[in-house]
Amino acid sequence: MTAAADLYCVMGNPIAHSRSPWIHARFAQLTGQSLHYERRLVPLDGFAQALQSFAAEGGRGCNITVPFKLEAAQLATTRSERVQLAGAANTLVFDGGSIHADNTDGLGLVADITQGAGVPLAGRDVLLVGAGGAAAGVLGPLLRQHPRRIAVVNRTPARAQALVDSHAALAALQKTELLALDMQAPGADFDVIINATASSLEGGPVPVPASVLRPGSLAYDMMYGPAAQPFLDWATGHGATARDGLGMLVEQAAEAFLLWRGVRPPSAPVLQELRAAIAAGA
């Protein structure tokens, strides 16, 4: 790191798997920005101290991954509307002793669906599978795309209803029907199905029936790599178009980069390079 390079990082536990340093290094090269971005493994009980240490080093911003997104939102000085709605933050901006929290996950998901996959969300029927932090982080930006309907399903129905209730005002403003449905019988023929659960990681079956799919539906798993494969295989086996969350990863990083540097990096070539690197075993 040169003296002129601004310091950024991603904090999480675990963190060794993170592709964020590579992504942001490519963004910096493509936009002519001078920065250094690194991984930081944070003890489960040491997140607040890690933020203090990073700020003392002159850190300018950091991405936050599991399990610290809720704590990041709580510890920030100011919070974006997206963070206030989701209750979680994945991007922190350090400025003059203050910490501003934002959440770019939903923006990344929307960009990858509408631009990467070329599927518009306006006027569509969307099924959001899961009601945890991942789902909460994306529901607001999904609603802002003016879909006709978003149905939320979850193993614990009360959590799905709570997520719906917390976003009811925004849904009404967007004139979108937002409701919680039975996970085992959510209805049929959704245009877009988004898996925001860790069902594949847990070794369980896909948590919704195949009746939610129709030929031409987009089935999107917010995970990527082996974790997403069971869901993707299930979707293609029932005639849907399947897409993993690697594009979401790159797009949310691009949004964070824009917040930090004031420059929007090109995401498409970086995603193409990243897919090639992963396919080659890098």
Swiss-Prot record:
Gene3D superfamilies: Leucine Dehydrogenase, chain A, domain 1, NAD(P)-binding Rossmann-like Domain. GO terms for biological process: amino acid biosynthetic process; aromatic amino acid family biosynthetic process; chorismate biosynthetic process; shikimate metabolic process. The active site is at K69. NADP(+) binds at E81, G130, A131, G132, G133, A134, N154, R155, T156, P157, A158, R159, M222, G245. It holds the Pfam family Shikimate_DH. It catalyses: shikimate + NADP(+) = 3-dehydroshikimate + NADPH + H(+). Signal peptide: none annotated. Coiled coil: none annotated. Keywords: Amino-acid biosynthesis, Aromatic amino acid biosynthesis, NADP, Oxidoreductase. The keyword NADP applies. GO terms for cellular component: cytosol. Its EC number is 1.1.1.25. Pathway: Metabolic intermediate biosynthesis; chorismate biosynthesis; chorismate from D-erythrose 4-phosphate and phosphoenolpyruvate: step 4/7. One of its GO terms (molecular function) is NADP binding. The keyword Amino-acid biosynthesis applies. Shikimate binds at S18, R19, S20, T65, N90, D105, Y224. Involved in the biosynthesis of the chorismate, which leads to the biosynthesis of aromatic amino acids. Catalyzes the reversible NADPH linked reduction of 3-dehydroshikimate (DHSA) to yield shikimate (SA). Homodimer. Belongs to the shikimate dehydrogenase family. This is Shikimate dehydrogenase (NADP(+)).
